[in-house]
Amino acid sequence: MSAVPPDTSPVVSISGLTKTFRQGNVTALQEIDLDLSAGEFVSLIGPSGCGKSTLLRVIGDLVEPSSGTVTVNGKTARQARIDRDYGIVFQDAVLFDWRTVRKNIALPLEMLGWDREKRRDRVREMTALVELTGFEDHHPWQLSGGMQQRVSIARALAFEPAILLMDEPFGALDEMTRERLNLELLSIWEQLRSTVVFVTHSISEAVFLSTRVVVMSPRPGRIAGIVPIDLPYPRTVETRENARFFELVTTVRELLRQRGEHLLPEEAPRAPGELR
């Protein structure tokens, strides 16, 4: 399978995007230009405080830009959110403890007015997709962190959004669980081919998952470079041992070093309300 999806029609177009947090008079993002094609898996990586999460949330209409434009399928980001074009997964699973796995996944479908039979069928499909069949009646507190994130992913994808926004979804997990979920996420993506925007601090994770890696500079966040990832899909555990994989990791690392990734998080404080 080709590393680049055959459908290259733009699904997200960002032009001249700048975000200033006025309370701290800090420019988090400056003059961002970026197009995302349908079915791409694009990772955003950069030093702490560079605006990765801010950019993702501007795309999802969770943060309003100071200037510039974001269009999604030819619509404003606001209209795209109203039309449910987005599914969003955060670092914390954000599940409701009093609802079972089944009912957590079904929540957006209830809000959209799906009838009970259609919800039941869709939840069955999604639990199978994220390999949680048999856990439908468990509550979040009965699940591991990795299983909770699978529920969160299933819920985000349940209503078939065109775009999946993921803000460091595996950042709090141990390395073994993280690598296993990387494989599971790619399996899901290869089946559904939603456009994925993925924020991470891990170079190897970004290279392993993505069709392209967008490297961001320290504040004010700009695009320092874009690295096409020409590793074939499906990717496996052996992909991480491939010589080309190491070459691409080195390419991304060098871009980060050139743009100041040596800065520690405490050397790049965030303004009030600013996101990473």
Locations of regions flagged by a protein language model:
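The feature captures the beta-strand-to-loop junction immediately N-terminal to the Walker
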Residues: I45-P47
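Short coil-to-helix segment of the ABC ATPase nucleotide-binding domain corresponding to the Q-loop/switch region
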Residues: R99-L107
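Helix-to-loop junction immediately C-terminal to a conserved catalytic motif
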Residues: G60
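Conserved signature/switch motifs of ABC ATPase nucleotide-binding domains
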Residues: H138-W141, F159
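ABC ATPase NBD coupling module
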Residues: K75-D92, M111, R116-R120, V237-N242
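Hydrophobic anchor residue at the start of the ABC signature
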Residues: I153
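Conserved ABC ATPase "signature" region
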Residues: E110, E117-F135, S187
